[in-house]
Each structure stands twice: as structure tokens, then as C-alpha cells.
A protein has these predicted regions:
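Short amphipathic beta-strand and strand-loop transition segments with alternating hydrophobic
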Residues: 46-55, 103-109, 347-350
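Oligomerization/assembly interface segments of phage tail-like spikes and tubes
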Residues: 52-71, 113-125, 188, 249, ...
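Short beta-strand-centered interaction patches in the first periplasmic/extracellular domains
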Residues: 2, 93, 110-127, 163-243
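Extracellular/virion structural assembly segments
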Residues: 23, 33-80, 126-130, 139-142, ...
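Amphipathic, non-transmembrane alpha-helical segments in extracytoplasmic/periplasmic proteins
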Residues: 58, 63-65, 120, 134-160, ...
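Acidic, small/polar-enriched beta strand-loop surface segments
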Residues: 1-36, 186, 190, 207, ...
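Surface-exposed cap/loop segments at beta↔alpha junctions
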Residues: 2, 69-159, 366-367
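Well-ordered beta-strand positions in beta-sheet-rich domains
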Residues: 94-99, 117, 260, 339-343, ...
Length: 367
């Protein structure tokens, strides 16, 4: 999550202001050029909304804006909204809410005037639309993150903070002409067991080694307390599917030795294990992995993510601007018997003071 200690205010001071009975919130809209350099502030955005979906295969973060300004170049300009929370001393604590590429707007003409409705997307769109002209080859011995950064730079995405690794490609890899650059990047990230590429609220490309939600500390807690910003209404759903209990993954390439990794659920307490079911359900797949260590980690990850049910919780809070992508939060709600960590799958934030922010959370229940 974004830091709550911003603009000279401490985390505790900002939390107190976020949880105050009365809050004063304003939104600003920063106009950027195609290099994310500031052009100025837009004073003609009358509203909009932002949504984030951590499981989306295209843009994770999308937005809608209503704009009356005619000075926007919708082909190249970008918008970075900011939420500003008024503090007790009269100053503001501010957070960026994403960098958005604009689509062609639709014009709406009414008696009160004309405005444009604009849909917008995070910078993953750049990497989806930019494709390789020829077969793209990365030679063996190339560092994975170096290869990824090279692709990002070639697409004009120069602000990136991919966690470094010492892993090298064990064999040359290639992708056919026309492959989106995002696909190549995520293939490389998957080979070293990193999370898919995403963009921060500030517009920086990010990825880090994958961690199970149980291994991650919550970024924030939503609790039903006296100063709670949590709505009293929420929904809970247990999404159950049949799952495998044995996973086999292989790496087979012409110029390297084959690799195999097997993971079997034999836990007697698990209702879907080979012991409990009395039969074996195999998930077999071919994957790309840098080495045996990476392959073992990938198979363990596949098994963990498959051997579970998802308890989905939908809740609403006051506007909380510090959420990023795929966060872990703690939810404490005694009336529903909830006190657990959840991964935030989706959130939506209206660009309107006093509105509610909706969160869709998932809790892993291993089976």
C-alpha cells in the first residue's frame, strides 16, 4: 500500500483524519504528457471513478472521467488523479490514484453545456498494444530482470522498479512476431516465480517475488469499532470448486536437460487429498522455469493456489486512497465471526467526496 505518512504528517495523524467523523476531501487532476511529465492541473473534470482488478489480464486499473476541457490531447495526454484529505491544521495529505491513458471520448451535449465522457487505462495498455515486429530472441545467460527492463524501456516505460534477481536464462528463448510485450514480460516473470507486472498509483512498473498471502503482513486493518469507517453491511460467499491433489510440471526444451517437479497432497486432514478422496486427480502442465529450484517453487505455488477454496467478502468503507494492487488486509467483524487476513481482489473508488469505496476480498481456505 502507499504510505500514510505523507506531506509531513505522521501515519497516526493521517489515520485519525481518515477515521474522523467528518472528513473534507477534494480531488485534483494532473495532466501529463506521453512521458508522464506534468503539463498542469485540469480544473474541468466534474467527476469519475477508478476501479482496480488484480486478476485482470489487460489493464489492472481503469478509470472514467467527465471532462469539459477542450485543451486535452486525447491521443497522447494522460491523467493522474490525486485525492487530498484536509488535515486539522488546514493542510492536506495527498495520494496519487494512478496514471491513465485516455481513450477517444464521447461528447455529451446538454442545455448546461458540453462535456466528454472518457474511459482510461493504466500503462499495461502500452505493453499490450506494443508488439514485436519480428521474432524476439533473448539469449541464454541474460539476466531475467535485465531482459524485462530492456523490453520496458523499448516501449517507452522508463519508470520501473522490478526487484533484482541473479537468475539467468538457462537457454535462449524466443517469441513469434506479433507477441505483445506484456506477454513476453509476464512469461519471464513467471519463470522466476515473480508476480505479474503491475503499475503503482504513481505510475511505476512493479513486480516482486511471489509470496503467499499467509506470508505477507496486512497493509491495513478494517475493524468494526467505534471509529470504524467500515459499513455495517457486507456479504460473504464460500466459492467451492473441485481441485486436483497431485501436480506435475515439466520443462522440456531442445537445448537443455528436461526438468520435472511433482507435488502431491497426502495430508490426512485435507478433504481433497489423495488419502481422503481415495483417488488421484492429476494436474499436468508444461511450464517455463529458469532451473529446478524455480520449477519446484512454481509447482508448490500452483498446488497451493489450486488446493483451496475462496471465501469472498464484499464490503464498503469510506474513501481510502492508499490501496494499490493485490493488497493484503486484515478484517475484524465480530458480528459475522470474521477475524482474518484477506487478499484484495478488486476495489472501486468514486471520485466524489463522501462516497463509499467498495472492496472485494478473498480469503484462502486450504483444502
Amino acid at each position: 500500500m502507499q504510505s500514510l505518512a505523507v506531506d509531513g504528517y505522521s501515519r497516526l495523524a493521517v489515520i485519525a483524519a481518515l477515521h474522523a467523523t467528518v472528513r473534507e476531501t477534494v480531488f485534483e487532476y494532473e495532466l501529463l504528457d506521453q512521458n508522464n511529465e506534468t503539463l498542469g492541473l485540469l480544473d474541468s473534470v466534474s467527476g469519475g471513478s477508478i476501479k482496480n482488478n488484480s486478476l485482470a489480464t489487460n489493464a489492472n486499473r481503469t478509470a472514467k472521467f467527465s471532462i469539459s476541457d477542450q485543451g486535452v490531447n486525447y491521443l497522447s495526454d494522460r491523467i493522474r488523479p490525486w485525492m487530498k484529505l484536509r488535515m486539522p491544521d488546514g493542510g492536506h495529505a495527498s495520494w496519487p490514484l494512478g496514471v491513465f491513458i485516455l481513450s477517444s471520448p464521447s461528447r455529451v451535449i446538454r442545455s448546461a453545456g458540453e462535456h466528454r465522457k472518457v474511459e482510461a487505462y493504466d500503462q499495461r495498455l502500452i505493453l499490450l498494444e506494443d508488439r514485436e515486429e519480428d521474432r524476439y530472441v533473448i539469449t541464454s545467460g541474460t539476466n531475467f530482470v535485465t531482459a524485462i527492463n530492456t523490453i520496458l524501456d523499448s516501449a517507452g516505460v522508463t519508470e520501473h522498479a522490478i526487484i533484482a534477481t541473479d537468475k539467468m536464462l538457462p537457454a535462449s528463448r524466443d517469441w513469434k512476431a506479433g507477441t505483445p510485450k506484456l506477454r513476453i514480460i509476464n512469461d519471464l516473470l513467471g519463470s522466476i516465480n515473480y508476480s505479474p507486472l503491475n503499475f503503482s498509483s504513481a505510475g511505476i512498473a512493479l513486480s516482486r517475488p511471489y509470496q503467499r498471502p499467509s506470508e505477507r503482513a496486512p497493509g491495513y486493518e478494517y475493524a468494526a469499532t467505534d471509529d470504524s469507517i467500515l459499513s455495517p453491511d457486507l456479504s460473504i460467499e464460500l466459492d467451492s470448486f473441485g481441485v486436483a491433489n497431485k501436480w506435475v510440471a515439466t520443462v522440456s526444451e531442445a537445448d537443455r536437460l528436461p526438468l520435472t517437479s511433482v507435488y502431491t497432497n497426502v495430508e490426512p486432514s485435507s478433504p481433497t487429498s489423495t488419502v481422503s478422496r481415495g483417488r488421484t486427480i492429476v494436474d499436468f502442465r508444461s511450464v517455463d522455469a529458469a532451473d529446478q529450484e524455480s520449477l519446484d517453487a512454481i509447482v508448490a505455488r500452483i498446488a497451493f493456489e489450486a488446493s483451496q477454496l475462496y471465501e469472498k467478502v464484499e464490503l464498503e468503507t469510506a474513501l481510502m486512497p492508499h490501496h494499490e494492487n493485490n493488497e493484503v488486509v486484515q478484517v475484524t467483524y465480530p458480528r459475522a465471526g470474521i477475524s482474518a487476513k484477506y487478499t484484495e481482489h478488486k476495489w472501486s473508488l468514486p471520485l466524489q467526496a463522501g462516497a463509499g469505496m467498495k472492496h472485494t476480498l478473498r480469503r484462502v481456505v486450504t483444502v
